[in-house]
């Protein structure tokens, strides 16, 4: 067999011989053995935990949960991500070997969800921190939807090119921008407002003469009427 040219197959080739390429072989081995790192922070992770049971049995897809990012090639984020958790999430992603993939599960992970409304400590989408391959909306998504997302990721891996996959992804990674915070005085400090105790000089004042001029005793009959 010539290592430079493609082998010539004829009708005499046995059925047990499989002709393929290195790219397809690499993609097949990758999609058949996805080892996920479960990054669950909220209620969406409970739905993913139901996949471990015998009803859905996610082991048939070759998914083996790992506790170390150095042994995982898929990170599944489920739940709200806060500003304090953002550096930890990015660090876990950086520790994963190439090639690596990300599934964003749930509305809180994709857009921040209801926790992002008037919140200064919630990240409005993990795609501002790490690149996301598959978005899985829902609050929370059903286990069937998680299986569908894994199937779509497997199809994406099957269409990848080997050279593009092993290429470092330093230029394609996106990180969160620096958020500018402004110091605002809290109205509930337990202290009296100085403006109420000491009104500004621009406030109109009543002179002493005017005060005593209109000050007169009022009878009870006038109060009743």
UniProtKB/Swiss-Prot annotation:
> Where mainly located?
plastid
Q: What does this protein do?
A: NDH shuttles electrons from NAD(P)H:plastoquinone, via FMN and iron-sulfur (Fe-S) centers, to quinones in the photosynthetic chain and possibly in a chloroplast respiratory chain. The immediate electron acceptor for the enzyme in this species is believed to be plastoquinone. Couples the redox reaction to proton translocation, and thus conserves the redox energy in a proton gradient.
Gene that encodes the chain: ndhK
User: Which cofactors does this gene product need?
Assistant: [4Fe-4S] cluster
Subcellular localization: Plastid, Chloroplast thylakoid membrane
Name of this chain's protein? NAD(P)H-quinone oxidoreductase subunit K, chloroplastic
Recite the UniProt keywords alphabetically.
4Fe-4S, Chloroplast, Iron, Iron-sulfur, Membrane, Metal-binding, NAD, NADP, Plastid, Plastoquinone, Quinone, Thylakoid, Translocase, Transport
What is the species listed in this Swiss-Prot or TrEMBL entry? Crucihimalaya wallichii
Q: Which InterPro entries match?
A: NADH_UbQ_OxRdtase-like_20kDa, NADH_UQ_OxRdtase_20Kd_su
What Pfam families is this protein classified in? Oxidored_q6
Disulfide connectivity for this sequence is: none
**What EC number(s) are associated with this protein in UniProt?**
7.1.1.-
Keyword Nucleus on entry: no
User: What does the entry's cofactor note say about binding and number?
Assistant: Binds 1 [4Fe-4S] cluster.
């Amino acid at each position: 067999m010539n290592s430079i040219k493609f082998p010539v197959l004829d009708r005499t080739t046995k059925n047990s011989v499989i002709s393929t390429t290195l790219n397809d072989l690499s993609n097949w081995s990758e999609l058949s053995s996805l080892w996920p790192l479960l990054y669950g922070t909220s209620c969406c992770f409970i739905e993913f935990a139901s996949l471990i049971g015998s009803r859905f049995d996610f082991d048939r897809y070759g998914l083996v949960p790992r506790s170390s990012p150095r042994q995982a090639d898929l990170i599944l984020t489920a739940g709200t991500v806060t500003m304090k958790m953002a550096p930890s999430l990015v660090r876990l992603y950086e520790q994963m070997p190439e090639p690596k993939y990300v599934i964003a599960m749930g509305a809180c992970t994709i857009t921040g969800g209801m926790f992002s409304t008037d919140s200064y400590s919630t990240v409005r989408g993990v795609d501002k921190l790490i690149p996301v391959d598959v978005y899985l909306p829902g609050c929370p998504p059903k286990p069937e939807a998680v299986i569908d997302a894994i199937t779509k990721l497997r199809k994406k891996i099957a269409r990848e090119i080997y050279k593009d996959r092993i290429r470092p992804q330093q230029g394609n990674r996106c990180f969160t921008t620096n958020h500018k915070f402004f110091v605002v005085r809290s109205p509930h400090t337990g202290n009296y407002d100085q403006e109420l105790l000491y009104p500004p000089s621009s406030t109109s004042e009543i002179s002493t003469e005017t005060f005593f001029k209109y000050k007169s005793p009022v009878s009870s009959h006038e109060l009743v009427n």
